[in-house]
Design a protein with these regions (language model features):
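Generic alpha-helical hydrophobic packing signal
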Residues: 21, 66-67, 80, 106-109
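Asp-based, Mg2+/Mn2+-dependent phosphohydrolase catalytic module
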Residues: 93-115
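Alpha-helical substrate-recognition element adjacent to the catalytic core
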Residues: 1-74
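A short acidic, amphipathic alpha-helical/loop segment
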Residues: 15-23, 82, 96-103
């Protein structure tokens, strides 16, 4: 299975990191798909805060076992446009989940949030 996790308020949470590790341990391909701007984009604009912010994302990705080439920065675009050929995507944003359900019939969008 090809599985994707949003980062902020999703894979940044310890319990979801454990879930991602379980998918990896079971042999599934796990990605991070985030609306964040890429480090390269931040560097080109001179926005050092993006570089610092993404260091935390890379740290968590390494901890979980997700290589850098399996991290997709959508640069603010709707995530569904980056999730063709994915089976499941976990996100805390209900609008992103709705867009996945509307546009990607073969991808299951799962809403993850704390009440």
């Amino acid at each position: 299975m090809k599985v994707s996790f949003d980062f902020d308020s999703t894979l940044s949470e310890e319990k979801n990191q454990k879930l991602a590790k379980k998918f990896i341990d079971a042999g599934h391909e796990v990605w991070i798909t985030t609306s964040r701007l890429s480090t390269e984009h931040g560097r080109s604009k001179g926005w050092s805060w993006i570089i610092t912010q993404n260091e935390y994302l890379f740290e968590i990705a390494e901890k979980v076992g997700i290589p850098k080439d399996k991290i997709k920065f959508t640069e603010g675009e709707d995530k569904w446009k980056s999730l063709y050929n994915f089976d499941i995507h976990f996100d805390d944003d209900d609008i992103e989940i709705e867009l996945i359900q509307e546009n990607l019939p073969n991808c299951c969008g799962v809403l993850m949030y704390e009440k």
